[in-house]
Regions:
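A short, Lys/Arg-rich alpha-helix, primarily the initiator
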Residues: 1-20
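Residues within the helices of the helix-turn-helix
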Residues: 15, 26, 55
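Short alpha-helical DNA-recognition segment
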Residues: 22-41
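DNA major-groove recognition helix of helix-turn-helix
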Residues: 43, 53, 72
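DNA major-groove recognition helix of helix-turn-helix/homeodomain DNA-binding modules
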Residues: 52-67
């Protein structure tokens, strides 16, 4: 239950951050070197991410891992 909830929360944070930067899912997925479909599942909270992918995401956003996780409970 907790992991499902945190995956959804993380996905919501990613979506808001991506939209704030004016990027489409396709553009952001390319920056992270993953498919748009896979990225979409992450945004919807349907898939957990590895630490390696979290690092790619934070690099693509130009933020630290700490900043990426700052709004999670």
């Amino acid at each position: 239950m907790y992991w499902e909830n945190i995956n959804v929360q993380f996905g919501n944070i990613l979506r808001k951050t991506r939209e704030t930067r004016g990027l489409t899912q396709e553009e952001f997925a390319l920056l992270c070197d993953i498919s748009r479909a896979y990225y979409g599942r992450i945004e919807r909270g349907e898939h957990s991410v590895t630490l390696d992918l979290c690092k790619k995401i934070s690099d693509a956003l130009g933020i630290s891992l700490a900043e990426l996780f700052a709004d999670l409970p």
